[in-house]
Protein backbone atom coordinates (compact mmCIF):
# COMPACT_ATOMS: atom_id res chain seq x y z
CA UNK A 1 0.00 0.00 0.00
CA UNK A 2 1.43 3.36 -1.01
CA UNK A 3 2.07 6.19 1.47
CA UNK A 4 -0.59 8.27 -0.33
CA UNK A 5 -3.17 5.51 0.17
CA UNK A 6 -2.26 5.24 3.85
CA UNK A 7 -2.62 9.02 4.21
CA UNK A 8 -6.00 8.92 2.47
CA UNK A 9 -7.15 6.21 4.87
CA UNK A 10 -5.96 8.36 7.79
CA UNK A 11 -7.86 11.37 6.50
CA UNK A 12 -10.99 9.34 5.78
CA UNK A 13 -10.93 7.76 9.24
CA UNK A 14 -10.58 11.15 10.91
CA UNK A 15 -13.60 12.80 9.29
CA UNK A 16 -16.11 11.41 11.82
CA UNK A 17 -13.94 12.74 14.64
CA UNK A 18 -13.61 16.06 12.80
CA UNK A 19 -17.39 16.35 12.56
CA UNK A 20 -17.77 15.51 16.26
CA UNK A 21 -15.05 18.04 17.13
CA UNK A 22 -16.88 20.78 15.25
CA UNK A 23 -19.91 20.07 17.44
CA UNK A 24 -17.72 20.15 20.55
CA UNK A 25 -16.15 23.43 19.47
CA UNK A 26 -19.58 24.91 18.84
CA UNK A 27 -20.72 23.79 22.29
CA UNK A 28 -17.67 25.27 24.03
CA UNK A 29 -18.40 28.62 22.42
CA UNK A 30 -14.92 30.12 22.48
CA UNK A 31 -12.58 27.15 22.57
CA UNK A 32 -8.97 27.67 23.57
CA UNK A 33 -6.07 25.71 22.16
CA UNK A 34 -5.94 23.84 25.48
CA UNK A 35 -9.55 22.69 24.98
CA UNK A 36 -8.77 21.54 21.45
CA UNK A 37 -5.64 19.65 22.55
CA UNK A 38 -7.55 17.89 25.34
CA UNK A 39 -10.23 16.66 22.93
CA UNK A 40 -7.64 15.80 20.25
CA UNK A 41 -5.54 13.62 22.57
CA UNK A 42 -8.56 11.55 23.61
CA UNK A 43 -9.77 11.10 20.04
CA UNK A 44 -6.26 10.49 18.68
CA UNK A 45 -5.38 7.77 21.19
CA UNK A 46 -8.64 5.89 20.71
CA UNK A 47 -8.52 6.27 16.93
CA UNK A 48 -4.98 4.82 16.98
CA UNK A 49 -5.94 1.84 19.15
CA UNK A 50 -9.09 0.71 17.34
CA UNK A 51 -7.52 -0.23 13.98
CA UNK A 52 -4.91 -2.26 15.85
CA UNK A 53 -7.67 -4.10 17.71
CA UNK A 54 -9.50 -4.73 14.43
CA UNK A 55 -6.28 -5.88 12.76
CA UNK A 56 -5.65 -8.39 15.56
CA UNK A 57 -9.15 -9.78 15.12
CA UNK A 58 -8.63 -9.94 11.36
CA UNK A 59 -5.28 -11.73 11.79
CA UNK A 60 -7.01 -14.50 13.69
CA UNK A 61 -9.43 -15.09 10.83
CA UNK A 62 -7.20 -14.20 7.85
CA UNK A 63 -5.90 -17.67 7.01
CA UNK A 64 -9.47 -18.97 6.72
CA UNK A 65 -10.50 -16.41 4.13
CA UNK A 66 -7.30 -15.53 2.25
CA UNK A 67 -8.79 -16.53 -1.12
CA UNK A 68 -11.37 -13.72 -1.05
CA UNK A 69 -9.76 -11.21 1.34
CA UNK A 70 -9.62 -8.46 -1.30
CA UNK A 71 -13.39 -8.70 -1.70
CA UNK A 72 -13.82 -8.38 2.07
CA UNK A 73 -11.56 -5.30 2.16
CA UNK A 74 -13.49 -3.81 -0.78
CA UNK A 75 -16.86 -4.60 0.82
CA UNK A 76 -15.95 -3.21 4.24
CA UNK A 77 -14.37 -0.04 2.89
CA UNK A 78 -17.15 0.59 0.38
CA UNK A 79 -19.85 -0.20 2.93
CA UNK A 80 -18.31 2.17 5.45
CA UNK A 81 -17.94 4.79 2.75
CA UNK A 82 -21.58 4.52 1.74
CA UNK A 83 -22.63 4.64 5.40
CA UNK A 84 -20.58 7.80 5.97
CA UNK A 85 -22.05 9.46 2.86
CA UNK A 86 -25.61 8.61 3.95
CA UNK A 87 -24.95 9.95 7.47
CA UNK A 88 -23.48 13.13 6.04
CA UNK A 89 -26.50 13.64 3.82
CA UNK A 90 -29.00 12.79 6.60
CA UNK A 91 -27.49 15.22 9.10
CA UNK A 92 -27.58 18.27 6.82
CA UNK A 93 -30.52 19.79 8.69
CA UNK A 94 -28.97 19.58 12.15
CA UNK A 95 -27.24 22.49 13.78
CA UNK A 96 -24.64 22.53 16.47
CA UNK A 97 -26.72 25.06 18.38
CA UNK A 98 -29.45 22.45 18.80
CA UNK A 99 -26.95 20.14 20.50
CA UNK A 100 -25.06 22.73 22.56
CA UNK A 101 -26.80 21.97 25.86
CA UNK A 102 -26.04 18.27 25.53
CA UNK A 103 -22.39 18.97 24.75
CA UNK A 104 -22.08 21.33 27.75
CA UNK A 105 -23.55 18.76 30.14
CA UNK A 106 -21.40 15.96 28.77
CA UNK A 107 -18.00 17.57 28.40
CA UNK A 108 -16.15 15.23 30.78
CA UNK A 109 -13.45 12.95 29.46
CA UNK A 110 -15.61 9.84 29.77
CA UNK A 111 -18.17 11.29 27.38
CA UNK A 112 -15.39 12.38 25.05
CA UNK A 113 -13.94 8.87 25.18
CA UNK A 114 -17.34 7.34 24.39
CA UNK A 115 -17.78 9.74 21.48
CA UNK A 116 -14.27 8.95 20.24
CA UNK A 117 -14.98 5.24 20.48
CA UNK A 118 -18.23 5.64 18.56
CA UNK A 119 -16.48 7.59 15.80
CA UNK A 120 -13.65 5.04 15.64
CA UNK A 121 -15.72 1.93 14.96
CA UNK A 122 -15.00 2.43 11.27
CA UNK A 123 -11.26 2.46 12.09
CA UNK A 124 -11.67 -0.95 13.73
CA UNK A 125 -13.33 -2.22 10.56
CA UNK A 126 -10.44 -0.77 8.55
CA UNK A 127 -8.07 -2.68 10.84
CA UNK A 128 -9.95 -5.90 10.12
CA UNK A 129 -9.74 -5.32 6.37
CA UNK A 130 -6.02 -4.44 6.56
CA UNK A 131 -5.29 -7.76 8.26
CA UNK A 132 -5.75 -9.37 4.85
CA UNK A 133 -3.11 -7.18 3.22
CA UNK A 134 0.66 -7.14 3.52
CA UNK A 135 0.92 -3.94 5.56
CA UNK A 136 2.41 -2.79 8.85
CA UNK A 137 -0.59 -1.93 11.03
CA UNK A 138 1.49 0.24 13.37
CA UNK A 139 2.23 2.70 10.58
CA UNK A 140 -1.39 2.85 9.44
CA UNK A 141 -2.67 3.21 13.02
CA UNK A 142 -0.15 6.00 13.72
CA UNK A 143 -1.20 7.85 10.57
CA UNK A 144 -4.88 7.47 11.48
CA UNK A 145 -4.15 8.72 15.01
CA UNK A 146 -2.10 11.71 13.82
CA UNK A 147 -4.68 12.67 11.19
CA UNK A 148 -7.41 12.42 13.80
CA UNK A 149 -5.41 14.44 16.34
CA UNK A 150 -4.79 17.19 13.79
CA UNK A 151 -8.31 17.28 12.40
CA UNK A 152 -9.87 17.31 15.86
CA UNK A 153 -7.79 20.35 16.84
CA UNK A 154 -9.01 22.17 13.72
CA UNK A 155 -12.56 20.92 14.25
CA UNK A 156 -12.78 22.19 17.82
CA UNK A 157 -11.28 25.56 16.91
CA UNK A 158 -13.52 25.99 13.87
CA UNK A 159 -16.66 24.63 15.51
CA UNK A 160 -18.14 27.88 16.67
CA UNK A 161 -17.79 29.49 13.27
CA UNK A 162 -18.58 26.63 10.94
CA UNK A 163 -21.19 24.60 12.79
CA UNK A 164 -22.33 21.30 11.29
CA UNK A 165 -22.23 22.45 7.67
CA UNK A 166 -18.56 21.56 7.21
CA UNK A 167 -18.80 18.58 9.56
CA UNK A 168 -21.45 16.90 7.43
CA UNK A 169 -19.53 17.62 4.22
CA UNK A 170 -16.36 16.18 5.77
CA UNK A 171 -18.17 12.92 6.47
CA UNK A 172 -19.35 12.74 2.85
CA UNK A 173 -15.82 13.36 1.53
CA UNK A 174 -14.45 10.73 3.93
CA UNK A 175 -16.98 8.22 2.63
CA UNK A 176 -16.00 8.91 -0.97
CA UNK A 177 -12.32 8.43 -0.09
CA UNK A 178 -13.05 5.05 1.52
CA UNK A 179 -14.93 3.85 -1.55
CA UNK A 180 -12.00 4.90 -3.76
CA UNK A 181 -9.48 3.13 -1.49
CA UNK A 182 -11.60 -0.04 -1.44
CA UNK A 183 -11.95 0.02 -5.21
CA UNK A 184 -8.19 0.52 -5.58
CA UNK A 185 -7.45 -2.51 -3.37
CA UNK A 186 -9.83 -4.65 -5.41
CA UNK A 187 -8.45 -3.37 -8.72
CA UNK A 188 -4.82 -3.96 -7.66
CA UNK A 189 -5.57 -7.52 -6.57
CA UNK A 190 -7.59 -8.40 -9.67
CA UNK A 191 -5.02 -6.86 -12.01
CA UNK A 192 -2.20 -8.83 -10.32
CA UNK A 193 -4.01 -12.16 -10.62
CA UNK A 194 -5.05 -11.78 -14.23
Swiss-Prot record:
GO MF annotations in UniProt: manganese ion transmembrane transporter activity
Main location: membrane
Pfam (any one): Mntp
Localization, UniProt: Cell inner membrane
GO cellular component: plasma membrane
TM region(s), chain numbering: 3-23, 37-57, 65-85, 112-132, 137-157, 170-190
InterPro entries in alphabetical order: Mntp/YtaF, Put_MntP
Family: Belongs to the MntP (TC 9.B.29) family.
Free-text function comment from the UniProt entry: Probably functions as a manganese efflux pump.
Protein's recorded name: Putative manganese efflux pump MntP
Origin species: Xylella fastidiosa (strain M12)
Species lineage: Bacteria, Pseudomonadati, Pseudomonadota, Gammaproteobacteria, Lysobacterales
Gene that this sequence comes from: mntP
